[in-house]
Amino acid sequence: MKLPLSRVAEFLSADGEFDRDAIATGYSIDSRTIRPGELFFAVKGEKMDGHDFVWQAIEKGAIAAVASREHISASDSLVILDAPGRGGRTRASAPTQSKSGLMVVEDTLQALQVLAKTVRRLWARPLIAVTGSAGKTTTKEAIAHVLSSRFRVHKSEGNFNNQFGLPLMLLKLEPEHDVAAVELGMSHLGEITALSQIAEPKVGVVTNVAPVHLEFFNSIAEIARAKYELIESLPDNGTAVLNGDDEYVSQFGREFKGKVVTYGLGMVCMVRAERVEALGEKGSAFDVVVGARRERATLPLVGNHNVHNSLAAVAVGMEHGLTLAEAVSALADLAPADKRGQVVRIGNITVINDCYNSNPKALAAMVDALMTIPAKRRIVVAGEMLELGPQGEEMHRESGGSTAEKGIDVLIGVRGLATWMVQAARDSGISAEFVASPEEAARWLSREARDGDVVLLKASRGVELEKALEIWQESAISHQPLAVRKSLLNDQRPKTKDH
């Protein structure tokens, strides 16, 4: 939302020297990507401090920079910076030609969040927040897609779901948007409460609870408690949309004073899927049942877990006035989010790129999806699953054994704890091999994958398993004639959709 700096300063109780009549056309915390006219917030992250890059942001055209008082000198509007090429700590004043300057606050991250909350309140329209251990992004994308059949929807980009990303997404709200859909992530208790206080959702969607982030939690029950914070944060006239098939999430509506809508495959679910038919890499078809109404849905996303994600979208769509038929119809051209179940081809080999993140429950769901696709061989390339805490080794063993028992042909474990998956898979009698990196995985795939194979790539974000796919693709293309190379490059661009 565009705002004059005078109003921004008022909202943030900021002082300093800057052009109060100037209009901020956007907001950024990254000096590398900032565009002219945007307001730069010098926030401190885990590895970098934005105050070290104020000068670069202003040189790139930032209309002003929001800096904390401790970084500002007592006179004028000078910032203590590590100015590039000057060596050591240097005092550099902001450029004056465009009246760019410094907006001074006590805490820059808090200021970013306060401004985001203020913009959200000025916008004053319905906002849907999605959380859960798995499926947040796909569910959010599905909700935005369904709602876009009638409304102008603002959605968070990718997984901008933390204390930095969520405020930046809210600051992009514009008067023309009718509704917004965001996701809320967490790794500690209290984080979803804090994010909800910024976003102020009217509708809260919880997808599931699974053993993730156990490095920071003592039990799955504690994870459930953290996810429940979204429901606690909803207003009494809000709506909780809950996975009725999840043993934890299904209980979240018991004490909620607002409206509760459950979805899933169980007979007690209010938005229910019946007669589910797996269509392999083409997705699935199923009946969506709401009361006495029934509509047949076609969903071009692989895996039964995506049936659940799409049911949440149907439920939210109907809560916003769409008919069952309208909501179900919108699912037919839903495209997968980046690195989340994207189907690509390398020659006559089918690859399911689901390597954005992983946990035992999510891996099991994708292996189930893999088993619905006809193949000469089914190969699972599984990277280690991070943040599982003391139970990490045991969970990798269990995942390796259960993956093998589903009937796959080969398991390749990538990095770290994935070695325990490989050992368990071998103990179950299938071919399994451990590699130390995505690069080694790419070499194995280039050498061993054959026509007719279907390959699943699944790993935690930190493994960066997408590198294996990129290297494998490049290797396959480099061995083809020029005309074929151009064709393959076009074919392998993932088909995703934005709203």
Where are these regions (language model features)?
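Active-site beta-alpha connecting loops in nucleotide-dependent enzymes
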Residues: 45-48, 337-339, 355-430, 434, ...
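Acidic, Mg2+-coordinating active-site environments of NTP-dependent enzymes
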Residues: 11, 68-73, 81-82, 92, ...
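ATP-dependent carboxylate/acyl-activation modules
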Residues: 130, 147, 338-342, 363, ...
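Short amphipathic alpha-helix with an adjacent loop that forms part of the alpha/beta core around
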Residues: 77-78, 441-448
